[in-house]
Each structure stands twice: as C-alpha cells, then as structure tokens.
C-alpha cells in the first residue's frame, strides 16, 4: 500500500448485529451505502464479548476492550478479568499498594474513602471490587470507611441504581462498619470531555459537602427519580446525619478509586492529585488525600497504582511503524482515546510515522440532541488527509454514544449519518485503488429496547460485522472470527508478516 492506494480501517462504534427489527436502530435506518457494500463485498461477523476479548464469560464488550483487541491482534485479558481473578485467588488482599494506603490511614487516624461506579456493568468498574476493598479495610482494622457512589445507568439499565444501593447497604450492614457519604451520577463524576463544571460539582460534593442533601443513599436516588433524573444524571447528593455530611475527603485521608477503565477516571483523579490544576477552582481548602488508582489511568498522574499496566508489544501500530508506513489516527473527542491510547495497547506515546487528529465533539448535554455528532467533520478531515498516509484508522462514535441515550429515533438518525459518511470514505478510497475494512467494536444501537419496549442504554453481547471493500478482495470470502483477527487480516492485505505475539489469524480464506 501507499498513499495512492491507502488501506483504511473504519470502526463503527456500537454497531452490532441483531436479528430483531424492533428497537434496532441499524435495521430501521435508511442505509443505502451499507446495504450495497454488504451485498457486494466480502463480509463476516466477529465475536466481541466475553472470553473472546479477555472478559469473563457473558460479559458484554465495550469500546476500550474492542480497540485493545483490534489493535493488539490477540486476546487481551482485561483489567476486569485480572482484578476479579485476584479477588478470587486471594492475591487482591495482599496487594502492597492497597494495603500500604489503608494501613497508613488507620495508623494516622484518617478515614478511608472508596469512590467509583456502583454497578456490575463491568465496563468501568465492578461492585465486587468495591466489596473486596471493604473486606480488605476490615482485615486491616480500618473501620472509618466511606463510599462515594457514582451511579451508572449506561452500562446497566437507566433506572437500576436502587438494586446496587441495596446490595451495598446490605454489605455494610453485614460487615458492621462503613457508610455511604455521597451519591453522584456518572454524568458529573466521570466526564471525559473537559466539561469541568460537571467534575467540579462531584468534587465539591465529596470535599466540601456541597450539593443536594439526603438522609440515605436510597433517598438520594429516590429524590433524583422524583426530579425526573435517571441514574446517570442524578445530581451530586451529600448524605447527611444530624444535618452534617457523613464524611468529607480531607488532607491525609486515603482515597481509592475503584474504577479500572482509564478514560472516564482521569478528570476527577486529576482534581485530587494535580498540584498545578486548571480545570476549575478547587476552593479555599482543596483536599490532597493519599490517592490510589486501581489501574493506571495515565502515566502523568502522580499516584500509586494497585494493578499496573500489561505491556503489549508488537501491536498493529508497532508493526506498521517498523515497516515505515505512515499512519493517521482520526476520531472525535469521545473516541479519540480509543483509536490512540487503547488501539496502541494502553500506550500514550505514538509510534514513529503515526499522526493523530482530534475533531471536537459537539458541546451538547446528551447526544440525542445532536445525533450527527461530529461525523461529517471527521469525514471532511479524512478526505483532507487521505493523500498523506498509507494507513488511516478512524472511528465513528455515533451509534454508541447516541445509543447510550436510549432514544431510538435519534439513534436511527445517527446510523443514517454514519452511512452517509461511510459512503464518502469508501468512494474516495476506491477511487485511489485502496481497501477499506469496516468493523464494529461492540454492540449497542442494534438493541435499544427490551421486550416491553423499555429503553436499553447498555452495550450488548451481539457480534459485530466486518466488511472488506476493494478490488484486492473481490471474489474472496471471509471466515467468522473475533476482534483479535482484524490486525492479522490487515497485515495479510499489506503483505507483511504477522509477529508471534499476535495470536489472531487472517480472516481471508
């Protein structure tokens, strides 16, 4: 391949394969380009959940996991799997970083705070990891333990928080220590798009006790529902006892963030760890607790990490760079980390010959208000740069991000926008004799309501499609596979040898 005959990988985020038409934004959308490509060019389906991508059996995939496996060309055992195994085999309770922090807080008379997403969605966190931390605190005789519960509503049903709150309260009652100190929708606590005003509200609730008030976590959720908020959007609420906050994060306290996925953990982490911080005004007495990251959120975050990163070598980006190929990574803000950091195996540093282009996502509260997102701008940027690169890896965020809103009509519009943009990409590549691979990373937009018609905002375990478009594959057939097989297929198309670390195999028959 050369810039005159480029190879392009287009990742359709959240575009899964579903049999039902009801609640299926992809099936209901008008997609003339997609339909034509499927009828003409080689296609197959790829497994993208559970053990096929390094997750526990039956666990739905997600964008982070999908891009890791796509770029690595092998099954990458995910942090969820690693940490859950550590809990089961007991090594979690011997983790030196966790023990050091908890023991120091007890020894110095300070509290232990545990913050993170209260959910079993398995995308950003798992409630079982929180329970393990609570048990570890007891083993180390730390009884001043406070939970700051971020509510999900995206990776699990949108109004399911009471189930998790009840499970947490039952656990605390069984243990005989600990309390919930705040309840905050992930919209505020886990923003990743530099909407610092959201992060600020979460921070001030935890540090200053500012925000709405409730006498219990259950009441905080119920009051949110009364205001018409689903779990994700429940406003930061401080739990009070006798009119005073149950607990606030103070200097010298220990604060363990039990989310394992980095992208939505970084902003709130930096508000606690960065000495020089410009995201928002932290107030007259910012807290600098003994902060622990469950996994590495960013190499530049100065805080100990309980479960360090896996080192992945010979990823697709490494191989392309070593063979002197110029590559572009292109996405809008919401998925930029996925085509860069995650696709490169959890490494921020770019390879020689790798350029990156970030297109800002629109500034709207939720993407059902603008289902087109920045797809057309991403496409314009692609067309402006197609002559410069041998390989372009790009992402369309719409099916996933709009799918998460649960608004079927908006998701249909999102899918139609992507189909329009995909047509422009394919036309430009074919005009230059190149090849386009179109792949999903996980399901979402193909299953947006349950049998009763209630909205579903979470990912699915459905497989995703893979199409290969170009004269180089005319008349060829593709075998079924999984996401790990995409990178070896790209190397096969380029005539490059597959490194031994890649356990996936080419899908070309």
From Swiss-Prot:
InterPro entries: Alkaline_phosphatase_core_sf, BPG-indep_PGM_N, Metalloenzyme, PGAM_B_sf, Pgm_bpd_ind. Its cofactor is Mn(2+). GO terms for cellular component: cytosol. It is an enzyme of class 5 (isomerase). Substrate binds at residues 124, 154-155, 186, 192, 261-264, 335. Gene3D superfamilies: Alkaline Phosphatase, subunit A, BPG-independent phosphoglycerate mutase, domain B. Keywords: Glycolysis, Isomerase, Manganese, Metal-binding. The keyword Cell membrane does not apply. Binds 2 manganese ions per subunit. GO terms for biological process: glucose catabolic process; glycolytic process. Belongs to the BPG-independent phosphoglycerate mutase family. Catalyzes the interconversion of 2-phosphoglycerate and 3-phosphoglycerate. This is 2,3-bisphosphoglycerate-independent phosphoglycerate mutase. It comes from Desulforudis audaxviator (strain MP104C). The lineage of its organism: Bacteria, Bacillati, Bacillota, Clostridia, Thermoanaerobacterales.
